[in-house]
A protein has these predicted regions:
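N-terminal intrinsically disordered/low-complexity leader segments
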Residues: 1-12, 215-239
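Hydrophobic alpha-helical connector segments
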Residues: 62, 76-106, 168-171, 200, ...
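Short hydrophobic clusters on alpha-helical segments that form packing/core surfaces
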Residues: 17-25, 67, 71, 94, ...
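Hydrophobic/aromatic-rich alpha-helical bundle segments in the mid-to-C-terminal region
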Residues: 105-109, 132, 136, 154-204, ...
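Amphipathic alpha-helical packing segments from all-alpha helical-bundle domains
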Residues: 76, 89, 116-156, 165-169, ...
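Helix-turn-helix
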Residues: 16, 20, 24-58, 62
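Amphipathic alpha-helical segments used for helix-helix packing
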Residues: 99-130, 182-185
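Alpha-helical DNA-contacting segments of helix-turn-helix folds
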Residues: 59-67, 142
Length: 239
């Protein structure tokens, strides 16, 4: 797991607390650990955590801020690439984020299950609910970039016109469920490179089928030359 791999004795205590919290969320769940569980592996006592965070909720809010900050950087624009290739890179990055930070998968699932647009930890970190972040807050720019990527595909003739929020719903829901159903073993250990590649390919195929222009609906978009979102070098740049 990324959190476990990046944790070192030389890291500031505040960072090490968050790294350990991420690890525990991944293996025990959002509500399955205590401050003592964080303190013990770090070789400190619980009062040392209170020097940095008011309580356990404070730790979870800060972990959520990490999540929001990384999520806010997703769907980066790649003007040097063609529309399909740029979207492929964005999809791959999204998969890497969630598979590299299994705690964020747990947080997202609990967040979705909380009435009122999300649980307080993530709402505080994001400055509002899911809906509010579509147009303002730290995630607004990410949603705007996703819209721009999709619009570029429409202009190039590679994508049909679709609502960006629907695409985000589809991608996030599909990825989260793949990582926890029928089991969540991918959250409990470092994924193998093959598992990451397979997941990227799977997400690309889902996106390809959803975005394929209607006139090509009878053609498998994954294998269609120059239109695929699957792994192909030919679509990396438009002529």
């Amino acid at each position: 797991m990324v959190a476990a791999k990046t944790r070192t004795a030389a890291a500031p205590t505040r960072q090490r607390i968050l790294d350990e919290a991420e690890r525990l969320i991944a293996v025990k769940g959002v509500y399955g650990f205590t401050l003592q569980d964080i303190a013990a592996p770090l070789g400190v006592r619980v009062p040392a955590i209170y020097k940095h965070y008011l309580n356990r909720d404070g730790v979870l809010i800060e972990v959520s801020r990490r999540f929001i900050a990384l999520l806010a950087g997703q769907f980066e624009l790649r003007p040097e690439l063609g529309a399909v290739a740029a979207f492929q890179v964005a999809l791959d990055s999204f998969v890497e984020l969630m598979m590299g930070h299994p705690a964020y998968v747990r947080l997202a699932l609990v967040d979705f299950a909380t009435p009122g647009g999300g649980m307080d930890y993530v709402k505080l970190a994001a400055g509002g609910s899911f809906k509010e972040n579509l147009v303002r807050g730290p995630l607004a720019a990410m949603h705007a970039r996703l819209r721009a990527l999709l619009q570029a595909g429409v202009r190039s003739g590679d994508f049909r016109a679709v609502d960006a929020t629907d695409v985000y719903r589809l991608l996030k829901a599909a990825l989260l469920i793949r990582l926890v159903f029928p089991d969540d073993t991918l959250l409990l250990r470092q994924p193998h490179s093959r598992e990451v590649r397979d997941t990227k390919r799977w997400i690309r195929e889902i996106a390809a089928r959803h975005l394929a222009p209607r006139r090509d609906a009878a053609i498998d978009p994954v294998h269609k030359p120059r239109r695929a979102l699957g792994p192909t070098r030919r679509s990396a740049r438009k002529p």
